Amino acid sequence: MKRIITLTVVNRSGVLNRITGLFTKRHYNIESITVGHTETAGVSRITFVVHVEGENDVEQLTKQLNKQIDVLKVTDITNQSIVQRELALIKVVSAPSTRTEINGIIEPFRASVVDVSRDSIVVQVTGESNKIEALIELLKPYGIKEIARTGTTAFARGTQQKASSNKTISIV
Amino acid sequence: GTNVQVDSASAECTQTMSGALMLIESLKKEKVEMIFGYPGGAVLPIYDKLYNSGLVHILPRHEQGAIHAAEGYARVSGKPGVVIATSGPGATNLVTGLADAMIDSLPLVVFTGQVATSVIGSDAFQEADILGITMPVTKHSYQVRQPEDLPRIIKEAFHIATTGRPGPVLIDIPKDVATIEGEFSYDHEMNLPGYQPTTEPNYLQIRKLVEAVSSAKKPVILAGAGVLHGKASEELKNYAEQQQIPVAHTLLGLGGFPADHPLFLGMAGMHGTYTANMALHECDLLISIGARFDDRVTGNLKHFARNAKIAHIDIDPAEIGKIMKTQIPVVGDSKIVLQELIKQDGKQSDSSEWKKQLAEWKEEYPLWYVDNEEEGFKPQKLIEYIHQFTKGEAIVATDVGQHQMWSAQFYPFQKADKWVTSGGLGTMGFGLPAAIGAQLAEKDATVVAVVGDGGFQMTLQELDVIRELNLPVKVVILNNACLGMVRQWQEIFYEERYSESKFASQPDFVKLSEAYGIKGIRISSEAEAKEKLEEALTSREPVVIDVRVASEEKVFPMVAPGKGLHEMVGVKP
């Protein structure tokens, strides 16, 4: 099962190495990592998307992460009401003849063209991972030259709804 | 450099000094008694400040010897072992010891030299990314970037190594950091927001445990090294007596509960007693204290404690639920938790039937061996002699393998902190240097290193340290001219294909000892043991005793890998 785990860590050298090493040591697969500064100086936020076997693995992973001296807080936010976003840059083969057509495709995704060359364009899209995948699928027939994805970054919404089932798939 | 020689008692205000001197002053602040170390290029500035510092430095003959000695010292004294090694190969020679200390939760503060900051990352001479190499086997690690950070880092390192679940902390010091001067102060507050080990148990869980005990019919305590790390053996005894709950030990827990106590069931696990293993198999309440359900203890998990409610007391929350589904998780320090449980003074369980059953098993299935000298001098008998001649009061250090299991089985410990063994990692070559560390921690104790002829040859160069310091360590080599446990498994599981487990040649260990200036004696029979062993073990000088034991003897009882504890074989002659 896929889990989204966020960590706040003291931004010291080696902290990321320790954490990713821990994943290797305990045999967990990382799908993506994002790291960046937080509102507090010297504290970074790391968002992991991981694949684990079951609840027990999540608990063990969370506890092992918590044991790290430089880790301040570990939260498995998968079942919370969350905002999760990923950014992708997609270089699509595009002759002038197909450019309008592609624009028509990306528009509902609120994606934008951020670079144009003679035979390709670069599309920038942000959103949840499955939205990005949907767009990639639609662009595939034109020929994708390159994709760069940031991986998911996420945190809990300010207001938590009760049931986890009423999570809406937002395309915005 | 213009170094200010600072009296450690008066260095309250800040002083300017080199990183190397800061290190020395910090160690004094931490009241370090001795350092186990080995010099080299990158730590020259540190060793220069060590000179005339008044700190005791033990020089082993290999860095691995230094760190295992520090482990032995830590295990026996309860204080952190301090190690220094140079960069590159000096540092990488520590890796086995770090892994050993990590898995057996021993507090170490390890300093490694590093090449100068200006050349880090350039594959400089004797450069190794020791932080990267040791991350999975250290509780925490640091690389010092500027001398001012050293005191803070050292203070944190000692705190982290010795609190919570103890473990090794590594501090990597680039050569220039040791030379550059900075402001020294050791008064700063510790600021580790991400490190706050839980020591006080949750009251609700304590109540649940008290109730579980009162309603149990077949309770048992499994006590591990956490009892020793928490200095809680007195509390364990009081609790077990108050509640009348029988106690089994893990390998590393031995000594935490007196072996001759009527409630003691022996060691559990792969080569544990029938009674301890059946107790874990049949119990309806298993209270694990400072143990981590190692596979060598549990056997096949499908069968382990299959009808039992599990209560798990551990200072490391990550151990709870890691292996066993736990109904009563108690995170806390073993001593504090046991004190709280004793204070509760709950109702005892109605377990007279259970205790009758356990007593019957104890009577029916004691540890055994066939005392037949035609097969050679039995190693179990040798351990019994060692026990007899040291009055059961020695500190015993071992490697891993058959000799370790026989020591665990036939040297019953009455007291805590007498047993120094490599449990989790199973490190050959651990016993001899660990015995040196133990002897340095307990100068008046009788320290016996029980080793195999295989493991002995991995770290025997440390005999020179024994000679140099005239430590009265007794090295008993259970010499069967093979890797006994490997041989045993090959005999049982690999149809007697003894692939590379028998040594085709062997040095003369007596002459070897003499070459080191240490008395060496050879014992080849029970008669010789009776004649020579007592004197050798009770003298106050170092001795190496080469004992030729029956080479085909196997360790029993045994739980084969993949089997449940109840499926153990070799429970009777």
UniProtKB/Swiss-Prot annotation, chain A:
Recorded metabolic or biological pathway in which this protein acts: Amino-acid biosynthesis; L-isoleucine biosynthesis; L-isoleucine from 2-oxobutanoate: step 1/4; Amino-acid biosynthesis; L-valine biosynthesis; L-valine from pyruvate: step 1/4
Molecular function GO terms recorded: acetolactate synthase activity; acetolactate synthase regulator activity
Keyword Membrane: no
ACT domain residues: 4-79
EC number(s) given by UniProt: 2.2.1.6
Catalytic activity: 2 pyruvate + H(+) = (2S)-2-acetolactate + CO2
Coiled coil start-end: none
Superkingdom, taxonomy of origin: Bacteria
Single Gene Ontology BP annotation: L-valine biosynthetic process
Cellular component GO terms held in the UniProt record: cytosol
Cytoplasm among keywords: no
InterPro entries: Acetalactate_synth_ssu (IPR004789), Acetolactate_synth/TF_NikR_C (IPR027271), Acetolactate_synth_ssu_C (IPR019455), ACT-like_dom_sf (IPR045865), ACT_dom (IPR002912), AHAS_ACT (IPR039557), AHAS_small-like_ACT (IPR054480)
PROSITE patterns, per database record: ACT
Cross-referenced Pfam families: ACT_AHAS_ss, ALS_ss_C
Keywords per UniProt: Amino-acid biosynthesis, Branched-chain amino acid biosynthesis, Transferase
Family (UniProt): Belongs to the acetolactate synthase small subunit family.
Subunit structure: Dimer of large and small chains.
The protein's name in its UniProt record: Acetolactate synthase small subunit
Phylogenetic classification of the source organism: Bacteria, Bacillati, Bacillota, Bacilli, Bacillales
